[in-house]
């Protein structure tokens, strides 16, 4: 009997037009629909069907396709098949295999490819899948089998487990194949390399030729109709079958899949939201289209919206993708009637503006603007970039700053009279007002107390009816209601009464300038005389008397002076409290000999008054080159002398440096606009006299004033702007309309919003509901903004006046066009003499020709190009360090210079490998590449006198240092001991004077991860939910903005004594830290690198460690041999240490040896087994280069093409190898320069190399290289490493004491003191975390590896000893087998506390834990640690009093 479920199934077959399919009836006999799961949100219907047996694959596939097709307009369809009597066969397993792999949900294309290349089979009822080897098996087990098994079951197969076995036959074939490959001759391999390179070259050319030329806009798929409805991205919230969007591409990636296809991934925004758009390639033309699409274009996309399992986000899978033309804003004003922006902020305005000056200048050029100003907040750091952008775009740059102007000190007393303060009668008054503007707001309460001798003798208190309802803000602030003022006396009547009340008195108020402004405005309004009585403002008086206070509000002062203050913000109570506060202050003023009213202002400006004034903004533009230098000086003083929260410019400093500058009145925070808004036309006119031009801005930029009720409404705002124009005309000063630009386009406002949000309460803009619209406006947009002024006035302020101002300003250059080096008298002769003296001392009175020629060539370059002083400075620094007992290591290519060697700057000798006799000066040079390093020459006695010969020379060309012509500015980097670095830095002040040396300044900008954090915080705090692509977009918009400043860790810039620093840059303190020891350049040092000499005086651990090793052992490190066989044995095994590789978990003994201790380099050592200094040089070069070892030299060695001595290791190898092979030296140099910078080798140069029989493998290796290490740098590092390794081999405890004291920061003291098992357990714990281990844990693991090695060598660690331990150094104990831990090894115990413990112990032994805590400044948690680990067993808890 047919069931209802069977009937439903037959209905389904009819619905999908399947019931008459011939030959398929049998397999669906008794088939049922068990249930249908409907997923509403994802629009997926899952049919659960029950059938007898597994369907034949072709039936299943056709049925599945027909089902999906039938429901395509309703939902996506999935099926789950339940079988009653399933029978598995090899046929069925194989037929379904590809479908199962594809639909298993396996994300990894590599795993999919692995799976597709195999087919499972049945063996004794087990399903078997073969793998070539254990690695492939592991991949399949971990990542593929589970999804594959589930997918089989879903389509009707019974549950089974796939068993993965290694295909022994296949594995053996692979092994035999490898052996066969190994057995091939070098000639065959070389020929293969030739063919590969040739094929690669042909393929490149072929691909260039075959790739279709993309002309015009990119189109992938079909053309999308212009009439197609566009969906805004913000409205896409769930999966959709078809949607069309358009937007701006802001990021692009093309991934190559293992299948050979390519995947295009775009991040696109329409500025309502952002989406990832994906498209797979189908043809080579598609791939060419992928390459043609770039970030920065607009596209229209039609596709489906789906949840991407990998991204865990909705993405758009594109069917059709069309590049479209997007009309950006244009400036359509006539050519000679374009505006110029005179107020603009770049991303160097700290955390406040988003675009680079380069972007603005480019846009100005696009719009046809002839000039643009850069006026960042208090900084000039965009000047160098602006200069370059201006030159590139042919746009004139106006160099300026928006400065924070402060008065040098405001008066305390006004209308001064010689009146005795103690005998005077005072009126202390306060007002309550409807707002902050004396011009537009009204007094609603006026109250005062009259006082004599500190006593109240009369009071005055009146409400005033303002004639309109009070705002809620006013009511909340003043506690005055409409009922209280309604029907009160008029303003005129109250003001007349108050004027009478004040006769013959001194008037006093707190922040009285505010109240006096309101009073005088009211008096003026009613034709009464303004205040003539002497008056005092207690706010600046308090700042003078109590500079230590941080705030000077009335309630703060009342608390300090013990004055009771009730009902604050009610006028009568505030007035009375101010009176008592004033009398208390008067006593303190008398102690400073302030006895009369006219004594107060003698003290104006004292006690850092500039800190207490509220800064007002002003635009300062450099008019001339002299003005630019004055701007540098003025900015420097604001940063170095007058920095307080922001860099401040006292008015007197601006006057001092005003020559060549133009000063404008700036924005709403400028004093002229503020005065017009709050104090009225007359006061504004007085303020405006100071400025060269006035400034107004579009109304949207003043919206915060409306929000804060500082301006009542739009009419008030237009009146203020109109009055600003009127004022400028009256004073005959130009007035200009500016944009106060902070970002490029309106839609970019969100980036600034995110930056400001990140600063929380520190930025007052966060109190605004909406930030002002401060985008870069076109001429048309600006004219429209000021249309309310009338067409003529709008054009005057938008176009005419700004252009006139531009024409008044000279062409200015903020950066120099050449290098200015310091001069040291006699430097040339000193360098010559130092060089020749050592050369003769080493090589004899008559120098060998090779030495003489090299020195002649170098001295001509060094002296002839004015580089002597650079060499001499370095020589003096190194000489002083050596004299003080610290070796100096050289970095970079300075070791390529024989003059540097002869003057003692570097130990590296760049001559070819050679012998020299220290006694009779006999020499012998190997000039044909027979040896890679002189240190590898066999030991030999002098054939003339029998003295043991010195072996030297690294065969490094001079050209790698100063270029082929010898005119490249030398960059001498020196590695001083980290302990000695500050001394070396300060020695430059001795050499050149404090005002001629500065630390190289740096600019810290918002990094990608930081920006991402800002966006996530903004998303959280504003309760929004951004897609991943939108987060990426917003983070990109916030990236690159100046966040702080700093200093280069080593760079010292030297100003020549015939110039001053302001010829190059302003100066400041790093991160505005006024306590810093050094001042830095204001400009990032990279921008002036080619103009001023930079010394790189680095701090490094190796010289510090060498010094400690020398101190502990008494051995001079310079006497250590460079070819000691025991030391060399470290690099190929562990026997020399007396341990096995298993014990120390390393196949070499180089743990803790600089340059050779990392896992990566140890792996290289295991593969290469270096035995010579030259090979160690190669290893150093290979490990620091990019694409020099991995995929290059490593493969050449593995396949037997070359051996270790032949590979390219350092950049200099290329030049010297090619010269030895017969390539001309200049061509060899050019090839080396191209290769080391990753530029490849041009075809014609390759032809020259082949003509000189350069092997093809060598050319191929060069073509892969992206970056190479200088050989001189490698030589200096390896030399230092060998010296340290020597102590590790022969003076182990000395080595370990130095290592743990100098190089280690993180310790597991408990494990180390308990022995090797505990250390091994700690290592295993960290290793088990894999990539989840923290950076601190990874650093600790390195330390534990060294600790384990030391323990395995038979030495021990001892826990801290309260009576013996050093503050920071590990010390060797009397038994010669134990290292005692210092106090800093205790977790959480810093160096300062460690030193305090030792200092206190030296004064007197600790008698208790309480004593240790008090005198040693040791916290309870540290006491607990020491107690738990038996450090304090001999100390009682508390001090005890003894009677005996």
Curated annotation (Swiss-Prot):
- Cellular compartments annotated: Cytoplasm
Q: Which residues form the Exonuclease domain?
A: 426-582
Give Gene Ontology CC terms. cytoplasm
Gene3D superfamilies linked: 1.10.150.870, 3.30.1900.20, 6.10.140.1510, Metal-dependent hydrolases, Nucleic acid-binding proteins, PolC, middle finger domain, Ribonuclease H-like superfamily/Ribonuclease H
Disulfide linkages recorded for this protein, renumbered to the chain, are none
- What Gene Ontology terms for biological process does this UniProt record contain? DNA-templated DNA replication
Which reaction(s) does its UniProt entry say it catalyses?
DNA(n) + a 2'-deoxyribonucleoside 5'-triphosphate = DNA(n+1) + diphosphate
- Select a single GO molecular function from the record's annotations and give it: DNA-directed DNA polymerase activity
Tell me its family.
Belongs to the DNA polymerase type-C family. PolC subfamily.
Protein name (record): DNA polymerase III PolC-type
Species of origin reads Ligilactobacillus salivarius (strain UCC118)
């Amino acid at each position: 009997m047919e069931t209802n479920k069977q009937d439903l199934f037959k209905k389904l077959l009819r619905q999908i037009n399947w019931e008459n399919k011939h030959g398929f009836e049998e397999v669906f006999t008794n088939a049922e629909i068990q249930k249908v799961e409907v997923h509403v949100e994802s629009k997926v219907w899952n049919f659960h069907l029950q059938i007898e047996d597994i369907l034949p694959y072709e039936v299943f596939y056709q049925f599945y396709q027909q089902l999906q097709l039938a429901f395509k307009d309703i939902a996506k369809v999935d099926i789950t098949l339940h079988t009653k009597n399933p029978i598995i066969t090899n046929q069925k397993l194989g037929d379904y295999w590809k479908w199962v792999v594809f639909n298993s949900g396996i994300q990894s294309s590599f795993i999919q490819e692995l799976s597709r290349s195999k087919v499972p089979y049945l063996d004794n009822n087990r399903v078997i899948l073969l793998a070539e080897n254990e690695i492939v098996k592991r991949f399949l087990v971990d990542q593929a089998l589970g999804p594959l098994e589930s997918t089989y079951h879903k389509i009707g197969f019974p549950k089974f487990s796939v068993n993965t076995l290694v295909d022994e036959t296949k594995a053996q074939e692979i092994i035999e194949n490898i052996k066969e490959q190994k057995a091939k001759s070098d000639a065959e391999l070389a020929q293969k390399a030739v063919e590969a390179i040739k094929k690669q070259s042909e393929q490149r050319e072929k691909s260039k030729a075959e790739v279709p030329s993309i002309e015009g806009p990119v189109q992938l798929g079909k053309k999308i109709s212009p009439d197609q409805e566009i969906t805004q991205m913000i409205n896409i919230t769930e999966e959709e079958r078809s949607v069309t969007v358009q937007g701006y591409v802001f990021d692009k990636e093309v991934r190559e899949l293992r299948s050979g296809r390519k995947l295009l991934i775009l991040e696109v925004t329409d500025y309502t939201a952002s989406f990832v758009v994906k498209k797979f390639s189908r043809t080579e033309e598609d791939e060419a289209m992928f390459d043609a699409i770039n970030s920065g274009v607009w596209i229209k996309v039609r596709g489906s919206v789906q949840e991407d399992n990998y991204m865990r986000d909705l993405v758009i899978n594109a069917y059709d993708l069309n590049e479209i033309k997007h009309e950006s804003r244009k400036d359509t004003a006539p050519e000679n009637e374009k505006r110029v922006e005179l107020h603009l902020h770049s991303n160097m305005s700290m955390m406040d503006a988003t675009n680079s000056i380069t972007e603005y200048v480019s846009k100005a050029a696009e719009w046809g603007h002839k000039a643009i100003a850069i006026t960042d907040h208090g900084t000039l750091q965009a000047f160098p970039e602006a200069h370059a952008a201006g030159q590139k775009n042919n746009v004139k740059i106006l160099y300026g700053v928006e400065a924070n102007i402060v008065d040098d000190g405001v008066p305390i007393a006004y209308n001064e009279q010689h009146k005795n303060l103690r005998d005077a009668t005072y009126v202390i008054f306060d007002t309550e007002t409807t707002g902050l503007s004396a011009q537009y707001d009204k007094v609603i309460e006026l109250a005062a107390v009259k006082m004599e001798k500190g006593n109240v003798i009369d009071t005055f208190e009146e409400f005033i009816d303002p004639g309109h309802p009070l705002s809620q803000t006013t009511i909340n602030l003043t506690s005055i209601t409409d009922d209280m003022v309604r029907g009160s006396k008029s303003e005129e009547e109250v003001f007349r009464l108050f004027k009478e009340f004040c006769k013959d008195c001194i008037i006093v108020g707190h922040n009285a300038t505010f109240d006096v402004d309101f009073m005088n405005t009211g008096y003026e309004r009613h034709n009464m005389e303004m205040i003539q009585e002497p008056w005092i403002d207690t706010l600046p008086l308090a700042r003078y008397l109590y500079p230590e206070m941080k705030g000077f509000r009335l309630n703060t002062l009342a608390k300090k002076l013990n004055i009771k203050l009730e009902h604050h913000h009610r006028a009568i109570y505030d007035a009375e409290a101010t009176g008592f506060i004033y009398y208390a202050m008067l006593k303190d003023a008398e102690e400073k000999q302030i006895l009369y009213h006219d004594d107060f202002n003698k003290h104006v400006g004292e006690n850092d008054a500039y800190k207490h004034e509220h800064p007002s903004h002003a635009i300062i533009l450099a008019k001339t080159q002299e003005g630019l230098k004055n701007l540098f000086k003025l900015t420097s003083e604001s940063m170095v002398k007058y920095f307080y929260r922001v860099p401040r410019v006292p008015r007197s400093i601006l006057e001092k440096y005003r020559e060549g500058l133009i000063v404008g009145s700036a924005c709403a925070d400028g004093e002229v606009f503020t005065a017009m808004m709050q104090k009225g036309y007359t006061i504004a006119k007085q303020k405006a006299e100071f400025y060269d031009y006035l400034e107004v801005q579009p109304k949207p930029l003043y919206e915060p004033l409306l929000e804060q009720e500082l301006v009542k409404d739009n009419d008030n705002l237009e009146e203020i702007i109109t009055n600003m124009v009127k004022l400028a005309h009256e004073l005959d000063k130009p007035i200009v309309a500016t944009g106060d630009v902070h970002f490029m386009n309106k839609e970019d406002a969100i980036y600034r919003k995110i930056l400001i949000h990140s600063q929380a309460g520190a930025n007052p803009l966060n109190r605004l509901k909406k930030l002002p619209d401060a985008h870069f406006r076109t001429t048309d947009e600006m004219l429209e903004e000021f249309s309310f002024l009338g067409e003529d006035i709008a054009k005057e302020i938008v176009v005419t006046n700004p252009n006139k101002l531009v024409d008044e300003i000279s062409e200015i250059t903020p950066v120099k066009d050449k290098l200015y080096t310091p001069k040291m008298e006699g430097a040339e002769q000193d360098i010559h003499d130092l060089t020749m003296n050592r050369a003769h001392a080493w090589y004899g009175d008559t120098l060998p020709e090779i030495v003489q020629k090299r020195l002649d060539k170098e001295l001509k370059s060094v002296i002839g190009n004015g580089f002597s002083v650079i060499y001499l400075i370095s020589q003096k620094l190194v000489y002083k360090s050596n004299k003080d007992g610290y070796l100096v290591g050289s970095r970079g290519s300075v070791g390529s210079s024989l003059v540097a060697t002869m003057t003692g700057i570097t130990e590296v000798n760049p001559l070819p490998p050679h012998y020299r006799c220290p006694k009779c000066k006999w020499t012998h040079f190997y000039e044909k590449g027979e040896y890679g390093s002189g240190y590898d020459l066999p030991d030999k006695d002098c054939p003339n006198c029998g003295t043991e010969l010195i072996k030297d020379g690294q065969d490094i060309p001079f050209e790698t240092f100063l270029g082929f012509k010898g005119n490249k500015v030398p960059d001498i980097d020196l590695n001083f001991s980290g302990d000695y670095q500050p001394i070396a830095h300060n020695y430059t002040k001795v050499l050149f004077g404090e005002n001629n040396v500065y630390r190289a300044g740096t600019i810290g900008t918002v990094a990608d991860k930081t920006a991402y954090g800002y966006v996530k915080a903004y998303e959280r705090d504003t309760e929004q939910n951004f897609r991943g692509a939108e987060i990426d977009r917003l983070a990109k918009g916030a990236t690159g903005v100046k966040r702080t400043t700093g200093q280069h860790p080593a760079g010292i810039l030297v100003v020549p004594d015939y110039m001053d620093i302001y010829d190059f840059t302003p100066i400041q303190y790093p991160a505005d830290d006024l306590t810093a020891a050094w001042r830095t350049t204001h400009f990032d040092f990279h921008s002036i690198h080619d103009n001023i000499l930079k010394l790189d005086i680095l701090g490094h651990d190796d010289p510090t460690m060498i010094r400690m090793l020398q101190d502990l052992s008494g051995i001079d490190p310079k006497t250590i041999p460079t070819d000691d066989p025991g030391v060399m044995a470290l690099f190929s095994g562990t026997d020399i240490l007396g341990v096995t590789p298993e014990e120390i978990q390393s196949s070499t003994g180089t743990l803790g040896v600089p340059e050779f201790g990392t896992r990566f380099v140890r792996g290289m050592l295991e593969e290469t087994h270096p035995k010579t200094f030259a090979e160690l040089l190669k290893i150093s070069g290979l490990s620091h280069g990019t694409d020099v070892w991995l995929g290059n030299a490593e493969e050449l060695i593995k396949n037997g093409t070359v051996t270790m001595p032949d590979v390219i290791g350092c950049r200099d190898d290329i030049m010297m190898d090619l010269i030895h092979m017969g390539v001309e030296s200049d061509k060899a140099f050019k090839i080396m320069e191209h290769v080391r910078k990753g530029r490849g080798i041009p075809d014609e140069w390759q032809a020259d190399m082949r003509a000189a029989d350069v092997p093809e493998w060598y050319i191929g290796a060069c073509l892969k290289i992206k970056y190479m290490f200088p050989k001189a740098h490698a030589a200096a590092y390896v030399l230092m490493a060998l010296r340290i390794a020597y102590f590790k081999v022969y003076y182990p405890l000395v080595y370990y004491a130095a290592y743990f004291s100098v190089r280690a920061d993180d310790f597991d003291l408990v494990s180390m003191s308990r022995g090797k098992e505990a250390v091994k357990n700690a290592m295993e714990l960290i290793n088990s975390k894999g990539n989840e281990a923290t950076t601190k844990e990874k650093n600790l693991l390195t330390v534990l590896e060294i600790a384990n090695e030391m323990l395995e060598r038979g030495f021990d660690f001892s826990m801290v000893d309260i009576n013996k331990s050093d503050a920071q150094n590990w010390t060797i104990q009397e038994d010669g087998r134990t290292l005692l831990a210092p106090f800093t090894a205790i977790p959480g115990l810093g160096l300062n506390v460690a030193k305090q413990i030792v200092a206190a112990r030296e004064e007197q032994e600790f008698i208790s834990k309480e004593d240790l805590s008090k005198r040693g400044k040791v916290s309870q948690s540290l006491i607990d640690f020491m107690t738990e680990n038996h450090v304090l067993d001999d100390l009682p808890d508390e001090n005890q009093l003894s009677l005996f």
